[in-house]
Amino acid sequence: MSTPAFSLRNPENHARCAKPLRKRKLSPPQIDTPRSFSPSRQKRAKTTKILGQSLPVHRIIETLDRNALQSLLQQVAAANPQVAQSIVDLAPKPDTKDALAVMRAKFDAITAHLPYKCSAESDYSYTRVKPYLCEFLSTLSDFILNMLPPLEVDLQPACTILDAITEMIHKLPNFSNSEFQYTRAMAYDQLSTSWQILLDAADERLLVRVEAEMGLSRRLQKHNELSGGKLTQAVESAGRGQSPLLGGLITVDYSSFRH
């Protein structure tokens, strides 16, 4: 039996035919990198997602000035009647000083917008200040209604405010415009009615006290003169504070009295 030409047992043939093996070099991509350092295998830390949000209402209010806050409240109240009623229910009652400050500011806006180069009583002057005059009269109406019975039970603050309102009507520029003359006459009529309602509803003892502290009858007599007699009925209503209870406050001279 012949031996195969390429028998592994023939070292001479094996040495002649076999090619020497070369040691393979590992290329860089084939080099194993520890998994802990592999960028593709690293786990990114989870971060909490934070979204922007609007300021709370109380923070928004803190940033607003007086005018901006007033404008905002008026817009909200106009759009939401229930909110408007909540404001009425929750807002503190304005005191006499604050109420008068608002009305005087409205009055000052009229005089501040009078033109310089023409008569303050001209039609042009009236047309220019008419929007401010209407706002002033509207403001007076709101405050007058707020201090009449049964809302107002304290007579003296109400009389103080109504006295100041009457004084401001006297001081309005006497525009020659017929529309203004009619408006002013109506204002005096409404003031007279308001005085009567306020004084007729007052207890006589309270009226006596206000008369003693304010000299109400004297003030109304002066207002009546300046209005051209349009407050006569108000003067008569105030007269209840002089008789009969006021008689106890009058000093009587008994020096000539004979027993």
Swiss-Prot record:
Residues 1-46 are annotated as: Disordered. GO terms for cellular component: cytoplasm; nuclear membrane. It is found in: Cytoplasm; Nucleus. The keyword Nucleus applies. InterPro entries: Cut8/Sts1_fam, Cut8/Sts1_sf. GO terms for biological process: nuclear protein quality control by the ubiquitin-proteasome system; proteasome localization; protein transport. Gene3D superfamilies: Tethering factor for nuclear proteasome Cut8/Sts1 (1.20.58.1590). One of its GO terms (molecular function) is proteasome binding. Residues 16-26 have a biased composition (Basic residues). Pfam families: Cut8. Keywords: Cytoplasm, Nucleus, Protein transport, Transport. Belongs to the cut8/STS1 family. Involved in ubiquitin-mediated protein degradation. Regulatory factor in the ubiquitin/proteasome pathway that controls the turnover of proteasome substrates. Targets proteasomes to the nucleus and facilitates the degradation of nuclear proteins. Binds the proteasome. This is Tethering factor for nuclear proteasome STS1. The lineage of its organism: Eukaryota, Fungi, Dikarya, Ascomycota, Saccharomycotina.
